[in-house]
Amino acid sequence: MSGSRATAATTTPRSAEPPRGLAVAYSGGRDSTALLHATLIAARDSGLTVHALHVHHGLSARADAWLAHCESQCRRWARRGLPVCFRAMRVQLACRSGDSLEAVARAARYAALRTLAVEQGVALVLLAHHQRDQAETLLLQALRGAGVAGLAGMPRSIERDGITWARPWLARPREAIEAYVRRYRLSYIDDDSNDDPRFARNRLRLQVWPALQAAFPQAEGTLADAARWAQQAAACVADLAALDLAACAATNDVLPLTAWRQLAPHRAVHALRRWLQQAGVTAPTAADLERLMAELPAGAPARWPLKGGELRRYRGELRFVPTPDATREPPAVRETTLALRRGGRYRLPGWGGVLVAERVRAGGVPAAQLAVLSLQPRRGGEQFQGEAGRPARSLKKQYQAAAVPAWARGGPLLYGGDGRLLFVPGLGVDARAMAAPGEPQLALRWEPLPTG
């Protein structure tokens, strides 16, 4: 696994409480420059502030100059009355043997963009990907042997980690963006890494694409159309897998194997893939899935190593157990309070995991009770009610009754401001704390932090 570390942040002068608005991922290249400029023009009379977010990877010797260019450009636009606020973050990439530099840099970039967006109080980040990017993505995924989900390419909009990532120009040809840049005489930088043949996308763009477009002039549009069809097909597969998992009474932590084995093979494999993703397995490979499909019905072995952890069968149930990260030093102090104001993923490194909150119509905790939460360890004597009308019992007995193994009982107990127990990792929401039907509410679940 790999990671990155934010080392510094640079910003133009701003008030202590910056106005809320939206953000644009701004590298300084042609596409993001055009998108930022167009967004500023559209926002000028709306009262919105547009936050230009720049990530300094340090991969190029010119990275400092690019940051300076982006900040200077935003200052010029601000002097012309455009509602821009520039923010930048430096990250240090940490690649390990076998890691893809492209993948590591991309993950670090999105993590930094999310951090910057949260700091500015915005929940919408615009990305400048266009139709050519989508066509290239489909080709790359096909060459990697991807399934329908990979062939779907990049979504036009997706919500992840409490942020909506949108690509408003995904159906726009590259030529239209080039024309926009010429029309407004926009200044942008040329990233020399785009000519580096070590990267697969660059080889495709520089060596394959010219020949492909010469032979098939409509390739960009038709490949993007194919990606849209694949997105619809992938959505159907995902919906069916979700229905199958619900029929199996699966949760994000547990897959009941007896019910799963009743599925037809072509449905079982997609249900298994979806469950693995929900359980926190990082991109299960085709070989992983083939092995599991062959060995799970046979009943042996009891453990399967996967990237980032291992699968374990326990009392007819399948669980994923992340591998402890020996390189991570646990914080000296655990988080003791938390405010959940909306759905999202809340990292709690002191407890070694992530609390996931999702808006639901039933089975959740009243949103009003989540404004002030107390996080506490097990001390003994806690009582948990699993179902309405059933007696509350000790956590030990509830864990045993639910067949939750010891290694799946980590994480904090969540108490409301009135001192009532609301949520227990591995067991869920206490029945006494559940919201009434129709009341705004959030479902909670606990996920161990990924390794690396």
From Swiss-Prot:
ATP binds at S27, G28, G29, R30, D31, S32. The keyword Ion transport does not apply. Pfam families: ATP_bind_3 (PF01171), TilS (PF09179), TilS_C (PF11734). One of its GO terms (cellular component) is cytoplasm. The N-terminal region contains the highly conserved SGGXDS motif, predicted to be a P-loop motif involved in ATP binding. NCBIfam families: lysidine_TilS_N. This is tRNA(Ile)-lysidine synthase. It comes from Methylibium petroleiphilum (strain ATCC BAA-1232 / LMG 22953 / PM1).
